[in-house]
Amino acid sequence: MNFETVIGLEVHVELKTNSKIFSSAPAHFGAEPNTNTTVVDLGMPGVLPVLNKRAVEYGMKAAMAINCEIAEHTKFDRKNYFYPDNPKAYQISQFDKPIGEHGWIEIEVGGKKKKIGITRLHLEEDAGKNTHTSHGYSLVDINRQGTPLIEIVSEPDIRSAEEAYAYLEKLKSIIQYTGVSDVKMEEGSMRCDANISIRPIGQEEFGVKTELKNLNSFNNVRKGIEYEEKRQAEVLKSGGIIEQETRRFEEATGKTSLMRIKEGSDDYRYFPEPDLVDLFIDDAWKERIRAEIPELPDKRQIRYINDLGLPAYDAMVLTLTKEMSDFFEATLAAGADAKQASNWLMGEVSAYLNAEQKELHDTGLTPENLAGMIKLIEAGTISSKIAKKVFRELAQNGGDAEQVVKDKGLVQISDEGALRTIIGEILDNNEQSIIDYKNGKDRAVGFLVGQVMKATKGQANPPMVNKILLEEMNKR
């Protein structure tokens, strides 16, 4: 029996506000444990939450960016549960009236585009963090408690691990463009749970789902889904049944393990938050927030293809992160050719960032010095090979491209007389290569070009070398 996988993703994104959603405590990452707290975060008796307007507006902006309808009337609710990192014994969230509903984003997998529906986007507060020690006790840090979150719940429209990966990449890109979050999974500002079920191909009814947690990277989301697909298929093929449960992805083994039997929403005993009034959002407020949304990646891709003549793949890669796209645009503004700038950013720059595990802002590269280097290549001042040395110097130490070329003595040798002298000496020492060339062995030319480049430390003008080399060999 063959099965179809049905996946829905729940993504939590921390909003980049200065203070928490219901208190005045700072909301930044990395502080000493239990220092970013107030009596509100600690759930002390008699204290009242105060709603952070900026968090609401960030939620509206994110919802609009993923094509959600913004509610005219929304409210907050108490989600009741006890856990050490939740001092109030309830979480303030949104239950039946979320701030955004009925959205969608478009993904592309294997050259095919597909719309993934968004059920809802709602606001809530984050919980604290437990650290379990090997000494039989746990440590609780309340710093994260009360940090504003949006939870984005997809429709069960995702059919594979690859589609889930593409959805997360696209969602991260869109949220990053809006500026409402850093969406850094390594810092916990973007987290994902996956709901996975399988059903026989052709069956309309959904299978029993399991919720998968501890997915701390996009790769782990993919691996967790792939494992869970196989596990559920094996259970059904052996005559077993799938239990509705929450499972943990174990990165060390690549497998999932049982955490607990899955709770339903009734288990949380939701009821309206009595300490916060309902929120009404009028059209004027919506339009003001909508006007603040910048050009999003899909529109930039279209502009890069239509206005700059870039291939669709280049446009997609360049717009995947706002930092890369903004850097590209600034490089063009500094005078670089669009295709050359695209090639460098997608090639050498991306390879360097991956190898060094850095972001663009962590390097010495600027749009101005990258554009300056590209213009030196176009002017024939340096070759593409020498440019790689210049690029590495700029990436590591910054500076001006032209000055680096001068200081390092990297100017391309384009003097015909000098090149003829060098080539003449090389031919004198490689008579067999001349004979091979005249006998039709083209690789002899490549060998001689390599000798010229070696003698000039890669600084000879390649087209001139080829031209002069052929002329000199044909004379002999």
UniProtKB/Swiss-Prot annotation:
One of its GO terms (biological process) is translation. Its EC number is 6.3.5.-. It comes from the Bacteria. SUPFAM superfamilies: GatB/YqeY motif, Glutamine synthetase/guanido kinase. This is Aspartyl/glutamyl-tRNA(Asn/Gln) amidotransferase subunit B. Transmembrane segments: none annotated. GO terms for molecular function: asparaginyl-tRNA synthase (glutamine-hydrolyzing) activity; ATP binding; glutaminyl-tRNA synthase (glutamine-hydrolyzing) activity. It comes from Listeria innocua serovar 6a (strain ATCC BAA-680 / CLIP 11262). Gene3D superfamilies: 1.10.10.410, GatB domain, N-terminal subdomain (1.10.150.380). It catalyses: L-glutamyl-tRNA(Gln) + L-glutamine + ATP + H2O = L-glutaminyl-tRNA(Gln) + L-glutamate + ADP + phosphate + H(+); L-aspartyl-tRNA(Asn) + L-glutamine + ATP + H2O = L-asparaginyl-tRNA(Asn) + L-glutamate + ADP + phosphate + 2 H(+). Belongs to the GatB/GatE family. GatB subfamily. Heterotrimer of A, B and C subunits. Keywords: ATP-binding, Ligase, Nucleotide-binding, Protein biosynthesis. Signal peptide: none annotated. Allows the formation of correctly charged Asn-tRNA(Asn) or Gln-tRNA(Gln) through the transamidation of misacylated Asp-tRNA(Asn) or Glu-tRNA(Gln) in organisms which lack either or both of asparaginyl-tRNA or glutaminyl-tRNA synthetases. The reaction takes place in the presence of glutamine and ATP through an activated phospho-Asp-tRNA(Asn) or phospho-Glu-tRNA(Gln). HAMAP family: GatB.
